[in-house]
């Protein structure tokens, strides 16, 4: 009986230890997620735009923002054509423009859309393209929607690319994205996304400590 009681006590202590570790681990993972998910407060803007990588989640957020500020232009960052695009064009293959079609279904008119050439469409290219747009449109406020895991790194890159003396850009994260700071480690998809972004953010701080 004593052995049984002792064994149960050991199991209880071990179980309590595991339960104590799990909340601490989850708290650390949530804190790690919040490092990535940096977001400004939404403000009225002259141009609202989503980065290339945020996909439908970013476009849904654009739709919400445009309903509250219908006079704002909607920016679409357009990566340059690739060899694959050229080959499809040569063969007469025309793919639907899903971005423009989704914006139309969200109630955004074609004449409200501003197309902005964005090089290869990565973070460096899109932030540089937006910086050039800001330089060409002084006094205009720009609001950019990005994926949550991309928030801090994109905001840092955009501020570096932004012209001095112009209204600072606003960067907010898409609430419809799969990545959430509260539970990103519970899905392989978001775990992969989070780890990749943590690595990229660390590299960004190494290259640009300020």
Annotate each predicted stretch with a short phrase.
Residues 1-17, 71-72, 81-90:
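A short, flexible N-terminal coil/short beta segment enriched in small residues
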Residues 2-38:
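N-terminal type II signal-anchor transmembrane helix
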Residues 24-185:
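A structural signal for short, hydrophobic/glycine-enriched beta-strand patches
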């Amino acid at each position: 009986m004593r052995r049984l009681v002792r064994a149960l006590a050991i199991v209880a202590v071990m179980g309590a230890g595991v339960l104590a570790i799990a909340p601490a681990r989850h708290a650390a993972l949530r804190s790690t997620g919040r490092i990535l998910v940096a977001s400004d407060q939404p403000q009225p803007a002259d141009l609202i735009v989503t980065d290339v990588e945020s996909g439908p989640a970013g476009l849904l957020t654009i739709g919400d923002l445009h309903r509250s500020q219908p006079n704002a232009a909607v920016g679409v960052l357009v990566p340059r054509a690739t060899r694959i695009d050229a080959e499809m064009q040569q063969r007469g293959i025309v793919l639907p423009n899903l971005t423009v079609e989704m914006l139309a279904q969200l109630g955004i008119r074609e004449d409200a859309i501003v197309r902005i050439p964005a090089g290869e469409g990565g973070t460096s290219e899109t932030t540089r393209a937006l910086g050039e747009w800001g330089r060409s449109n002084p006094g205009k406020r720009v609001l950019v929607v990005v994926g949550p895991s991309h928030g801090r790194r994109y905001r840092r890159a955009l501020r570096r690319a932004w012209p001095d003396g112009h209204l600072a850009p606003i960067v907010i994260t898409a609430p419809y994205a799969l990545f959430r700071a509260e539970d990103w480690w519970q899905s392989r998809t978001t775990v992969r996304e989070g780890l990749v972004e943590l690595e990229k953010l660390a590299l960004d701080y190494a290259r640009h400590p300020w």
